[in-house]
């Protein structure tokens, strides 16, 4: 956990409505997940308990990111149920913050959700994917031809097209994010 206060980043961020309005690429997918997502009674009880913490959050994201089209709407809905106000920052416009949250110490992978306590200090960090989604994409990438193969680019585009379709339409994928975030926030 960071002992750096992130209130200024929170204040700089966009609301969910403003972020969604700014989208060009994955707005339809994000909206579909947001509108169709459902929670169990157990989920709702956890979200209610979390609402007592008076947290807020900063999200590093970008419209072009397929993972964000899955994770942002799921976690926005969790935040709404948990009384956690999220603010959204575009990754490439906020590299000073992004570089504090590199995946595996090197990658500017997004989305990254930085949950802040009532004083603006980091309480939890989640992202960029649930372990199950990471395993799925790792397995799929392993099936790609070598990077210098003539059909690599075509096969890679097909892989990401299929991945984007699955994560924006399959409630089982949404559930992996719910469970992963729930475990992180309760911890």
Residue ranges and their predicted role:
Residues 1-55, 80-81, 85, 99-108, ...:
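Non-globular targeting/processing and membrane-anchoring segments
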Residues 39-41, 68-70, 95-97:
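Short amphipathic alpha-helical surface micro-motifs
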Residues 46-77:
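Local sequence-structure signature of Cys/Sec-based thiol-disulfide redox active-site neighborhoods
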Residues 58-61, 75, 83-98, 116-118:
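Thiol-based oxidoreductase modules, predominantly thioredoxin-like and allied folds used
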Residues 65, 94, 121, 131:
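Surface-exposed, flexible loop/turn segments at secondary-structure boundaries
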């Amino acid at each position: 956990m960071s002992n750096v206060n992130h209130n200024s980043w929170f204040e700089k961020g966009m609301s969910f409505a403003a972020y969604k309005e700014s989208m060009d690429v994955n707005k339809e997918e994000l909206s579909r997940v947001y509108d169709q997502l459902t929670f169990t009674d157990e989920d709702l009880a956890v979200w209610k308990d979390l609402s007592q913490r008076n947290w807020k959050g900063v999200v590093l994201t970008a419209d072009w990111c397929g993972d964000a089209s899955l994770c942002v709407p799921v976690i926005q809905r969790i935040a709404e149920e948990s009384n956690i106000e999220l603010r959204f920052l575009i990754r490439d416009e906020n590299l000073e913050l992004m570089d504090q949250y590199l995946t595996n110490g090197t990658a500017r992978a997004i989305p990254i959700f930085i949950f802040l306590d009532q004083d603006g200090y980091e309480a939890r960090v989640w992202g960029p994917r649930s372990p199950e989604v990471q395993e799925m994409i790792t397995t799929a990438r392993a099936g790609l031809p070598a990077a210098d193969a003539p059909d690599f680019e075509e096969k890679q585009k097909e892989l990401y097209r299929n991945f984007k379709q699955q994560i924006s339409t399959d409630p089982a994928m949404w559930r992996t994010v719910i469970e992963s975030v729930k475990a992180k926030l309760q911890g």
